[in-house]
């Protein structure tokens, strides 16, 4: 799947600034809402569902919304700031959760299964060299550094991590995915946020 879809872009700060994301199609958004208004129901009777479908259609640029092929990309990494004692558990939990994701046994995996979405767990920086079947290997480094003492990542590592995410999404698009959700696992989100 994604492993076979190699994209050889070399990312730089300047290159990232030049990336263009097509904005949602405002006319399509209005058209889809108008289509809902022609359905036999009270005006806005479907509530937020009408707005959600209009947003999806505007992003896809198509009023015939097809999200039959969907994925959840789950990025897994450890953060060095855990050394400050700010987490109730150690970094070994990240690896355990990633293994659970690879088996589709995590909460995200189970929710994805109920919607028919594929799951793509990614090791972007787990502090372990263990190879896990079903876990896409895109490791930038073995966990970040402790940002309480030094920068968590170098500029080059940051660019590599961003590039990895872009390449995974491009691979999904090339594989026919119509909608992608993202998730993550690490133990220190409240601290790094």
Regions found by a protein language model. Give the residues of each.
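Glycine-rich, mobile lid/loop segments that gate access to catalytic sites or pores
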Residues: 143, 150-184
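Conserved small/polar residues in nucleotide/adenosyl-binding loops
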Residues: 185-191
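A structural motif shared across PLP-dependent enzymes of the aminotransferase-like
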Residues: 128-137
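Generic N-terminal amphipathic, Lys/Arg-enriched alpha-helix
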Residues: 7-23, 27-40
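An N-cap/entry alpha-helix motif that binds or orients negatively charged groups
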Residues: 27-64
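Solvent-exposed alpha-helices and their adjacent loops that cap or buttress functional pockets
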Residues: 60-68, 112, 171-175
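Gly-rich Lys/Arg/Thr-decorated short loops/hinges at beta-loop-alpha junctions or inter-strand turns
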Residues: 35-37, 89-92, 139-153
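Active-site cofactor/substrate anionic-group-binding motifs, chiefly glycine-
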Residues: 66-69, 73-126
């Amino acid at each position: 799947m994604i492993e076979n879809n190699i994209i050889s872009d070399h990312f730089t700060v300047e290159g990232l600034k030049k990336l263009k994301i097509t904005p949602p199609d405002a006319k399509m958004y209005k058209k889809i809402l108008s289509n809902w208004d022609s359905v036999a129901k009270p005006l806005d009777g479907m509530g937020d569902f009408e707005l959600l479908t209009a947003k999806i259609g505007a992003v896809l640029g198509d009023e015939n919304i097809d999200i039959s092929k969907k994925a959840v990309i789950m990025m897994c990494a450890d953060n060095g700031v855990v050394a400050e004692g700010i987490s109730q558990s150690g970094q070994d939990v990240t690896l355990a959760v990633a293994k659970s994701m690879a088996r589709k046994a995590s909460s995200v995996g189970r929710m994805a299964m109920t919607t028919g979405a594929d799951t793509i767990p990614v090791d972007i920086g787990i502090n372990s060299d263990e190879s896990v079947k079903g876990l896409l290997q895109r490791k930038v480094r073995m966990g970040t550094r402790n940002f309480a003492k030094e920068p968590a990542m170098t500029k080059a590592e940051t660019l590599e991590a961003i590039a990895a995410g872009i390449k995974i999404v491009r691979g999904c698009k090339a594989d026919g995915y119509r909608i992608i959700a993202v998730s993550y696992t690490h133990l220190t989100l409240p601290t790094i946020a």
